[in-house]
Amino acid sequence: HTRSLSVSWLGDVYKRQVVVLGIYYKLQTFLYLPANGIVQGMRPLIGYNYGAKQHARVKKLYELTLIMSAAIMAAGTVICLFASRPLMQLFTSNPETVAIGQTALRIICLGFVVSAVSTTSSGALEGLGKGAESLVISLCRYIVFIMPLAAVLCHFLGANGVWHAFWITEVLSAIVAYPVYRKAVGKR
């Protein structure tokens, strides 16, 4: 799991950052939940329309889901940018941890909107019965990009490098996800 691997990179030196990472993952669950729900709802619809050879509907469903997910994630970005302190204070009263968490949320949330591309593409591929292609996107998000980026950026930026690894991973994953989706949909 990404969280366990990220924590191992931070180790004992960054105990407060490890706490912040745990808090972020709790918040992430709530921030991504509405977008993930929309993606879950798209899966059977896109699969049905693909099977019925209604390719224009497949495209429309993908685009609509992408727009709705991006809008939800834009709201999440705004919340994290402007309410990072109260969000952190839901979990801790330690001022140092809150300060570190504010920085983390403000950096990580920069990738929220673009994450809609990989989550929508991955969900659409699953709905189309193309699990291998969906797995490629998931592996990019959770292992291929984030772990090396976190290790390298942590070396140069300290714990903030881990936070930057999140949004950079989302950008790189989106760059991979959309062409993987397009190629898979092109195979009829």
Tell where the protein language model's regions lie, with residue ranges.
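Transmembrane alpha-helical segments of integral membrane proteins
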Residues: 119, 145-152
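Transmembrane alpha-helical core residues of multi-pass small-molecule transporters
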Residues: 11, 25-28, 72, 140-142, ...
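Short extramembrane helix-to-coil loop segments that connect adjacent transmembrane helices in Major
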Residues: 15-17, 156
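Short alpha-helical transmembrane segments in multi-pass integral membrane proteins
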Residues: 46-111, 152-188
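Alpha-helical membrane-protein architecture signal
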Residues: 6, 20-23, 97-98, 136
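Single conserved hydrophobic/aromatic residue that forms the stacking wall/gate
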Residues: 1-14
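Alpha-helical transmembrane segments of multi-pass membrane proteins
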Residues: 29, 35, 95-121, 140
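Small-residue-rich hydrophobic transmembrane alpha-helices
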Residues: 20-84, 115-134
